[in-house]
Design a protein with these regions (language model features):
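Long, hydrophobic alpha-helical segments
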Residues: 1-8
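Helix-loop-helix units of permease transmembrane domains in multi-pass membrane transporters
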Residues: 8-39
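Short amphipathic alpha-helical coupling elements at transmembrane boundaries
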Residues: 16-23, 91-94, 128-132, 141, ...
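Alpha-helical transmembrane segments and their short interhelical loops
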Residues: 28-29, 33-104, 163-186
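Transmembrane helix segments
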Residues: 90-137
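Short, membrane-exposed interhelical loops at transmembrane-helix boundaries
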Residues: 137-166
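Short cytosolic juxtamembrane segments of multi-pass membrane proteins
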Residues: 187-194
Length: 194
């Protein structure tokens, strides 16, 4: 869902609705983007909670209070990062066809080149390196750890080819990625919204 966050903005841009918003007497034009980020984040977290609740009812377990907090923080960071990327692409690319193409080209490789479907130890060396550098892996491993038992963020969650990665490191990497993406798209948003 967050990877598609830029599509509504792109359609608003193409059909002229965004121009109408830009001439409205808003206190801050960045509130247009902020509203989109808040909406996508809330929707993604609700969908995730619904999936987690359904999994718990079906007998797959519940992460507990501290585990739930870790899952929500991890999802929040991931959703913010992917939403920032999608919104940046929505303002950088000329039309929705290009945006949809980028989304489709990025979506499945991000999933398959991560630890979502198989642990690193099952992967060939080259794929293990890709998965160990994939931001999605840094979100999957803390969530997996939250479901596996007692929560310890200092424990090694990922035995990457370049070294061991702890739960705290995963969250810090996601935080740096999120902040970096928002800082990277900020000049573009300022230019396009002014």
């Amino acid at each position: 869902m967050p990877l598609n966050a830029g599509l509504p903005v792109m359609f608003d841009r193409e059909f002229g609705f965004l121009n109408r918003l830009l001439v409205a007497p808003l206190r801050s034009r960045s509130s247009i983007v902020l509203a989109s980020v808040i909406y996508i984040t809330a929707l993604s977290l609700l969908q995730s909670l619904a999936i987690m609740g359904t999994a718990a009812v079906l007998g797959y377990g519940w992460p507990g209070i501290s585990g739930l907090a870790l899952v929500l923080v991890t999802l929040l960071l991931l959703v913010f990062a992917v939403t920032a990327l999608s919104l940046g692409l929505a303002f950088a690319l000329p039309g929705h066809i290009e945006l949809i193409a980028v989304i489709f080209v990025a979506n499945l490789p991000l999933l398959f080149a991560s630890t979502a479907l198989a642990p690193l130890s099952f992967m060939p060396t080259w794929l293990g390196w890709l998965a160990a550098l994939n931001p999605l892996t840094f979100a999957i491993e803390p969530i997996r750890a939250a479901y596996q038992g007692p929560l310890d963020l200092s424990a090694v969650l990922l035995e990457a080819p370049y070294g061991d990665v702890t739960g705290t490191s995963c969250l810090l990497i996601l935080l740096v990625l999120t902040i970096g993406l928002f800082l990277a798209i900020r000049p573009l948003l300022n230019r396009k919204l002014s």
